[in-house]
Amino acid sequence: MIGILGGMGTQAGLDFCNKLAILNRGKIDQEYPLFILFNKSNIPGRPESIGVQTKNLSDKSKNKKVKKKYHSVLKSLLQGCKVLKESKCKFIVIPCNTAHYWYEDLKKKINLPIVNMPKEVFNHTKKKCKKNSSIGLLATEGTLKTGIYNKFFDRDYNLIFPNNSLQKNSVNKAIKLVKMGKVREANKIIKPAIEFLVNKKCKKIILGCTELPIAIFAFKSFQKIKTSKIFLDPNLILANSAMKRYLKK
């Protein structure tokens, strides 16, 4: 059984479940995959809980706050993983890119496999793109700051991000609008950031926040870009990986 730790955000978790079901359509109910979605929407905000500790003694109080926020999110993620483990799930997926900042500590504390979303996206990209290609990344500021994609991609690819203005006024706003249920508005807002990466000759664009595929694929916008298969949807890639692992059990 697949364990899905969702709620980051809720629509992203539901989007993952939908993709999981579509990937393995059954003719009857019994042919669909067994999975449990724990929509743990009370996990503290991930971008707000990311900070960089410094060695400056005057920043001790700041470092304590950073550490406290980090462990607050870790504790909540761990609680969710434990619920899925107790529900007899064989492995866990987390359809939230930023949450993978806590991946290594989670893995140490829970005796159950957790599929690493950024790693799966990297493995998928290796099959599609030559080394040293330019790869665009649309994501939260938290994901960009922590380098969870850089960790895998910097060895072989040139990751390109939107500039600060586009990050703030296009990407961040689009993500927020999806969380608010305003998908049509998000679809319009994200357009300048996509055009920026296309003009930078990116071979692929990673939709590195699970709200972004919802914004982009909900309507008929970007039809020409979509047909070029430039977008990499981490939720879909993760769902594919989960199904392969599930079918091996």
Predicted regions and their residues:
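Non-catalytic structural scaffold of enzyme domains
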Residues: 1-249
